[in-house]
From Swiss-Prot:
Transmembrane segments: none annotated. The gene is rlmE. It is an enzyme of class 2 (transferase). Belongs to the class I-like SAM-binding methyltransferase superfamily. RNA methyltransferase RlmE family. It comes from Pectobacterium atrosepticum (strain SCRI 1043 / ATCC BAA-672). The keyword Methyltransferase applies. This is Ribosomal RNA large subunit methyltransferase E. It comes from the Bacteria.
Length: 209
């Protein structure tokens, strides 16, 4: 019975996905994913990216966010990206394939950042979803805590943090933690984000000293 429910849910998701206007637009424009449109909407309202910036992109594959940010930071900017999945090369993006939860991968990522002053850390990481919130939400919260840990390690004073979070247990505490570290925190739900999805994007700017 559970398998039937899962297959019905998967079929519905696939049907929604391939008829989604943002998926169709992404294909038409030659973009890597519909996530490009989410980031574009956030950039229009929050102006996170400027020419010459150094940006860390966590959960980067297939590359929609990195593809967008390259257009905003220009040739003098730099993106250090990481994902457990492979990603086709993008000019201006230094990509590391590996599991961000692995200490050796984290160490390698920090080495690539080096002494660079990172102005933005962004995370679109998500676990493999089972469809059961009691299982999925804790896994998601673990990833976003790791992303916040990366901010503590590399983000310059005044820098910004953009993170996808699934609303559920632990969300309010996480939001309070971010508010203690940044001067301004907003919650965004871009139009390109599916309405019934629990995902929201926390936009935190002005990292405190």
């Amino acid at each position: 019975m559970a398998n039937k429910k899962r297959s019905a849910s998967s079929s519905r998701w696939l049907q929604e996905h391939f008829s989604d206007k943002y998926v169709l637009q992404a294909q038409k424009k030659g973009l890597r994913s519909r996530a490009w449109f989410k980031l574009d909407e956030i950039q229009q309202s929050d102006k996170l990216f400027k020419p010459g910036m150094t940006v860390v992109d966590l959960g980067a594959a297939p590359g929609g966010w990195s593809q967008y940010v390259v257009t905003q930071i220009g040739g003098k900017g730099r993106i250090i990206a990481c994902d457990i999945l492979p990603m086709d090369p993008i000019v201006g993006v230094d990509f590391l394939q590996g599991d961000f939860r692995d200490e050796l991968v984290l160490k390698a990522l920090l080495e690539r950042v080096g002494d660079s002053k990172v102005q933005v850390v962004m995370s679109d990481m998500a676990p493999n979803m089972s469809g059961t919130p009691a299982v999925d939400i804790p896994k998601s919260m673990y990833l976003v805590e790791l992303a916040l840990g990366m901010c503590r390690d590399v983000l310059a004073p005044g820098g910004s943090f953009l993170v996808k979070v699934f609303q559920g247990e632990g969300f309010d505490e996480y939001l309070r933690e971010i508010r203690s570290l940044f001067t301004k925190v907003k919650i965004r739900k871009p139009d390109a984000s599916r309405a019934r999805s629990r995902e929201v994007y926390i936009v935190a700017t002005g990292r405190k000293l």
